[in-house]
């Protein structure tokens, strides 16, 4: 993410904190002096303090939810969670998961779900709890679809 905000941050400042597009809305609201609207961006947090070189607000994870077929990189409906260096992918069609340590495997080439079953179960539980908390819609079955 590249930010130009004259007089508000040091030129050339680089930060390696993960952010997600849902953070843009509360960030822009705060940048222009408007109040944030948490009901409109329940997962987004303002990045203004981060942009200005301060501490980032801690969050319990970054979540993705794609309950449909798309070209977003996932081949089938699924969800994902990132917490620290760990990322878990859940595939809704067959109930499988993949687990990656992004610090050691940024390209997500080595699935650790069988080697780290406790971590996979913890993240899967956290992902499913988040879906319930935000009322995430799941894809309804299509009775007309045939394999």
Q: What are the residue ranges of the model-derived segments?
A:
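Generic structural marker for isolated residues within well-ordered, non-membrane alpha-helices
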Residues: 25, 109, 127
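Active-site-proximal N-terminal segment of extracellular/periplasmic enzymes that hydrolyze or transfer
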Residues: 110-118
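C-terminal cap/loop subdomain of S1 sulfatases and analogous C-terminal strand-loop tails that border
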Residues: 8-10, 17, 22-102, 133-139, ...
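Intrinsically disordered, low-complexity polar regions and short flexible loop motifs
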Residues: 105
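Charge-dense polyanion-binding interfaces
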Residues: 122-140
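Short glycine- and hydrophobic/aromatic-rich loop-to-beta-strand nucleating segment
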Residues: 1-3
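Hydrophobic packing residues in well-ordered alpha-helices of helical domains and bundles
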Residues: 81, 120-123
């Amino acid at each position: 993410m590249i930010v130009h905000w004259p007089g508000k941050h040091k030129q050339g400042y680089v930060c390696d904190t993960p952010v997600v597009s849902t953070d843009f809305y509360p960030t822009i609201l705060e940048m222009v002096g408007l109040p944030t609207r948490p009901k409109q961006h329940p997962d987004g947090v303002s990045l203004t303090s981060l942009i200005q070189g301060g501490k980032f607000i801690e969050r319990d994870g970054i979540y993705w939810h794609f309950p449909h077929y798309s070209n977003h990189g996932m081949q089938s409906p699924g969800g994902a969670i990132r917490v620290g260096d760990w990322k878990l992918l859940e595939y809704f069609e067959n109930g499988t998961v993949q687990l990656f340590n992004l610090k050691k495997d940024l390209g997500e080439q080595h699935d650790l779900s069988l080697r780290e079953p406790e971590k996979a179960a913890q993240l899967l539980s956290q992902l499913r709890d988040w879906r319930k908390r935000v009322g995430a819609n799941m894809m309804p079955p299509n009775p007309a679809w045939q394999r």
